[in-house]
């Protein structure tokens, strides 16, 4: 009510606010007319038939006893005037909509319970047309035959959604008391129309409650729900009372179903993400295993290559060592050959002299032997001293020649001895140098092997660093 008063105060230019509401004269109506008018009265939309105008006059008479009710009634009439102007504008633009359908909305007056002193079965007095002649939204009374109940219900269902959209666009909200009456009268609509409306209402409720419904279906379902509230509020006036029922609690089963659906969707999304992560993990494991196999094969190939290279290098080093030994042997042989070649003439002379002295010595020994054999060995020996002396002299002379020759050969032999000693000393020095070369060759071989090992380690370290950089960059 306060919201409606605030809306009416926001529009002070409406002429219906200051106009006094005259008291309608009492009139008698038939029960049939009363039944039809009370059936189609609603606190949401304005009435266009004569029965709705008579019910509005009755409500005006009931609420005009106090100034507060009079002020509220004026505010409601002002809002109804504004709403009627909008409806007239819409009716002018819509050529396919009949006038009776456009004016079949109910009165916007709130339902109030009649005092206990008045008879609830009293006939509703109709308000004459000339009472509200100054209002722009006063409907004209149409002399039409009373429609049937099913026809009016169908007309109500067709026009309620458009009227509800119009009321929502104008900014008019419903009070909490009308919601209870709508729940009560909706049951009567279901009873009157039969099971024809049940499938559509259930499907609309399902479409409205599902979390995956589109905004368009939700808006349509909300319009249909407001339509049923309008129909229930209009049918609540049939009994003459406006008691509001307690609000219906939301369907906990539907909420639980939606929660379960959301939870299932979340679980499905989690399962999908876990599957994606597992697939990515398997891909990475496959990539790592493939890279590890490749690195192992490359490592084995490199080790085989290094081993073969090491064998080749060891063979080369052995061959080099052998060649060096041969070279040193040849060098020493050359040195000895040069020394011997320088002494070859002397040696040849020595051979000639040796032959001569050997022959002379042999002859001397033979001569001495012959001379000794000629000496008599019995008692009757007679020696010629002269011949013996001559033989001894000859022998001594030959011995002296031999001694002289030997004396001549002694310095040569001493020289040869010095040369041989020098040669022995040189050969010892060469042996020591050969041993030093052997040790140096062993050291170079070990250092070469160590160098190859360090190079292989350096290559492996550089390869590992390159692989780590590649993995970090990926």
UniProtKB/Swiss-Prot annotation:
Biased composition (Low complexity): 38-55
Changes seen on gene knockout: Aborted seed development.
Record keywords, A-Z: Cytoplasm, Cytoskeleton, Phosphoprotein
InterPro entries: QWRF
Induction of expression: Cell cycle-dependent regulation. Up-regulated during the G2/M phase.
Modification after translation (UniProt): Phosphorylated.
GO cellular component: cytoplasm; nuclear microtubule; nucleus
Region annotated Disordered, chain positions: 1-149
Modification type Phosphoserine: residues: 66
Sequence motif QWRF motif, residues: 283-286
Location of the protein in the cell: Cytoplasm; Cytoplasm, Cytoskeleton
GO MF, one example: microtubule binding
Tissue: Highly expressed in young siliques, seedlings, flower buds and open flowers. Weak expression in roots, and not detected in older siliques and mature leaves. Expressed in the embryo sac in prefertilization ovules and in seeds following fertilization. Detected in both embryo up to the heart stage and endosperm throughout most of the syncytial phase of endosperm development. Not detected in the cellularized endosperm, when cell division has ceased.
GO biological process: cell division; endosperm cellularization; endosperm development; microtubule cytoskeleton organization; seed development
Segments of skewed composition (Basic and acidic residues): 1-10, 89-100, 128-137
Record's subunit section: Interacts with GRF5 in a phosphorylation-independent manner. The binding to microtubules occurs independently of the interaction with GRF5.
Record function comment: Microtubule-associated protein required for seed development and for microtubule function in the endosperm. Associates with nuclear microtubules during mitosis. Binds to microtubules of the spindle and spindle-poles and to midzone microtubules out of which the phragmoplast emerges. Not associated with cortical microtubules. Required for endosperm cellularization. May be bound and sequestered by GRF5 in an inactive soluble form during the early stages of mitosis.
Family: Belongs to the QWRF family.
Name of the protein in its database record: Protein ENDOSPERM DEFECTIVE 1
Species, as recorded: Arabidopsis thaliana
């Amino acid at each position: 009510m306060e919201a409606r008063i605030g809306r009416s105060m926001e529009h002070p230019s409406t002429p219906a606010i200051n106009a006094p509401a005259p008291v309608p004269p009492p009139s008698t109506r038939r029960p049939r007319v009363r039944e039809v008018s009370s059936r189609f009265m609603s606190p949401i939309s304005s009435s266009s038939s004569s029965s709705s105008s008579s019910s509005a006059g009755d409500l005006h008479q009931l609420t005009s006893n106090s100034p507060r009710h009079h002020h509220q009634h004026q505010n409601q009439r002002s809002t109804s005037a504004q709403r009627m102007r909008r409806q007239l504008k819409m009716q002018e633009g819509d050529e396919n909509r009949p006038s009776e359908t456009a004016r079949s909305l109910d009165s916007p007056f709130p339902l109030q319970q009649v005092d206990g002193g008045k008879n609830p079965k009293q006939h509703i007095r109709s308000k004459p047309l000339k009472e509200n002649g100054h209002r722009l939204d006063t409907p004209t009374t149409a002399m039409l035959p009373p429609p049937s109940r099913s026809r009016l219900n169908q007309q109500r269902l067709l026009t309620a959604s458009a009227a509800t959209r119009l009321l929502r666009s104008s900014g008019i909200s419903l009070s909490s008391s009308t919601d209870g009456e709508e729940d009560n009268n909706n049951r009567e609509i279901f009873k009157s129309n039969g099971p024809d409306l049940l499938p559509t209402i259930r499907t609309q409720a399902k479409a409205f409650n599902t979390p995956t419904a589109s905004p368009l279906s939700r808006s349509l379902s909300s319009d249909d729900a407001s339509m049923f509230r309008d129909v229930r509020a209009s049918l609540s006036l049939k009994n003459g009372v406006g008691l509001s029922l307690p609000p219906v609690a939301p369907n906990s089963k539907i909420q639980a179903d939606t929660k379960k659906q959301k939870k299932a969707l979340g679980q499905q999304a989690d399962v999908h993400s876990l599957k994606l992560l597992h697939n990515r993990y398997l891909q990475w494991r496959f990539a790592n295993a493939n890279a590890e196999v490749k690195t192992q094969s490359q490592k084995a190939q490199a080790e085989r290559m290094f081993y073969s290279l090491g064998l080749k290098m060891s063979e080369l080093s052995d061959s080099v060592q052998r060649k060096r030994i041969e070279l040193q042997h040849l060098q020493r042989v050359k040195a000895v050959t040069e020394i011997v070649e320088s002494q070859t003439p002397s040696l040849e002379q020595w051979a000639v002299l040796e032959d001569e002295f050997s022959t002379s010595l042999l002859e001397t020994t033979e001569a001495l032997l012959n001379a000794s054999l000629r000496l008599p060995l019995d008692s009757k020996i007679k020696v010629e001293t002269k011949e013996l002396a001559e033989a001894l002299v000859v022998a001594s002379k030959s011995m002296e020649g031999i001694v002289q020759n030997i004396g001549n050969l002694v310095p040569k032999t001493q020289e040869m001895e010095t040369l041989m000693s020098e040669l022995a000393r040189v050969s010892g020095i060469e042996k020591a140098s050969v041993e030093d070369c052997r040790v140096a060759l062993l050291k170079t071989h070990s250092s070469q092997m160590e160098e190859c090992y360090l190079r292989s380690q350096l290559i492996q370290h550089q390869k590992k660093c390159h692989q780590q950089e590649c993995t970090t960059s990926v």
